[in-house]
């Protein structure tokens, strides 16, 4: 106990450590915390548990904090950018969450070996939220709650099928609640085909 002023624990020997040890739960003794005097950093050898609503603050002004309130966990940054980086060669950044059945599944990952983003679950855009493609957002896809639109603001809008002998097929409602083909671009013959009994009105 200390009742006046600060309380110091000091190791004066050059390049030596200050080691906090305790029982290891099996009748022995082990290090829990080491202040390493030879390299100038602190090594934590055992888990640290923060109780609910006690945050871990990083930075002189606690600019980055991690906390858990008993129900939810928050990572909060209040100064500058918040960057997530993986410097491991060919390593990935993987985002996982509950799979709806009590398990864990990958939703998407940043693949460092092939430098692309892999998406394993649906992406849902709310009504009136555009998906933009191109540096200037020149191609946009959106749904307004009633209708869907593809919009191109620069250059041509091309629909291309590179598969040998395959088609581009245009389908729509058949007037009876089903879907049928109205016409298709036949990749095996090079013709535009209109199925039987389809009227072409001008």
Enumerate the language-model features and the residues they cover:
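Self-maturation zones of extracellular/virion spikes and adhesins
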Residues: 1-32, 37-202
């Amino acid at each position: 106990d200390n009742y006046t002023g600060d309380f110091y624990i000091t190791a004066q020997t050059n390049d030596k450590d200050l080691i906090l040890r305790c029982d290891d739960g099996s009748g022995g003794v082990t290090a829990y915390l080491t202040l390493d005097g030879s390299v100038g950093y602190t090594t934590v050898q055992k888990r640290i548990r923060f109780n609910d609503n006690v945050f871990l603050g990083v930075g002189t002004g606690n600019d980055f904090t991690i906390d858990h309130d008993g129900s939810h966990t928050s990572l909060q940054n209040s100064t500058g950018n918040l960057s997530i980086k993986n410097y491991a060669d060919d390593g990935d950044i993987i985002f996982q969450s509950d799979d709806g059945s009590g398990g864990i599944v990958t939703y998407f990952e940043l693949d460092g070996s092939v430098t692309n983003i892999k998406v394993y679950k649906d992406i849902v855009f709310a009504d009136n939220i555009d998906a933009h493609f191109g540096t200037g957002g020149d191609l946009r896809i959106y749904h307004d709650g009633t209708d869907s639109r593809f919009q191109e603001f620069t250059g041509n809008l091309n629909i291309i099928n590179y598969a040998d002998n395959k088609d581009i097929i245009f389908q729509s409602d058949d007037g009876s609640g089903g879907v049928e083909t109205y016409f298709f671009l036949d990749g095996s013959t090079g013709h535009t085909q209109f199925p039987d009994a389809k009227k072409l009105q001008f």
